[in-house]
């Protein structure tokens, strides 16, 4: 199906007038009774290389749809695949990547479930092959699939093996020349059977892997605590701290480097985002409560080459608390980060700002002055931001997946009907 390019001039605030132009391209209509299409931890919802862009979403009937656009084109080709997912559970996200030969890799529909992975039958094609294993081991209890591409065209694949409160982080690598997956780390971060790590990661332009995570002691989100960090210079084989001391693997509670100490019952959210700048310095986005007012605030944790720093991003005024299990319905989105030559962009959505696609922006972190940008003139419900990290690294281009979506608390369905799916480009 050919879908013509629909450019919508976005209503921007006066503070955004000096920013690059924004455009929306409609690519289809997606399931919206949960946030399964719009969770921040989709790795990735939209991706690209020098030749093509690709995006994936569940349609109104819960079928996986793949959209391709040739770079420079005004149209998207959208294909409904043979695969369906349990869209009632927002954990069952679709994650995609393009390897160095242009083949699309996809993992989807997993929340403590057997691996569902397939590859396209041809380069830049949406005809997907049969489900297949990767390594064939440790693939029975998978959650949070996330792909990353290396500069030579190989892929990395991270996932949690095990359940909330007692899972381990696993890492595979796809060898482009051999066209097969290999295990790199069986247990990169070990919860020791008592806790698990909720990670976020970023592969920088030099193939350095930046990994950060919070610990969770039980299934209850209120037991999230602390923010930890590790870095790999060799595609996940060895890992080190910011002082260059090497980790003995697996990393545990007692051996981890702590970027920021955050106690339990601080409304600390898991599965947020991180990035790195051109110098390889890591930036981590999250939110938590740290004062008597009980209002969670957006935070930025970053390393400047000498030490870890932490600051509040903007100012929120709506109180809420995090407790219990499942997908939480809260008034703010988990944030997404982009670092460009123009500074730091901190993407979010908050009820008190009209639930629109929004961002805080600063050119100088040390000033702690953040400019508020409104990027849509319409609300997006419970949407969370996910972006094309390849476009960001390749050409400093910010591309977001945008869709209005509802979400009930604890995996409950909302009454939100199917909604338009857009790709937003910010120059």
Task: Pin down the residues of each PLM region.
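Hydrophobic h-region of N-terminal signal peptides that target proteins for export
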Residues: 9-17
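Extracellular, repeat-based ectodomains that mediate carbohydrate processing or recognition
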Residues: 19-427
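Sec-dependent signal peptide recognition
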Residues: 2-9
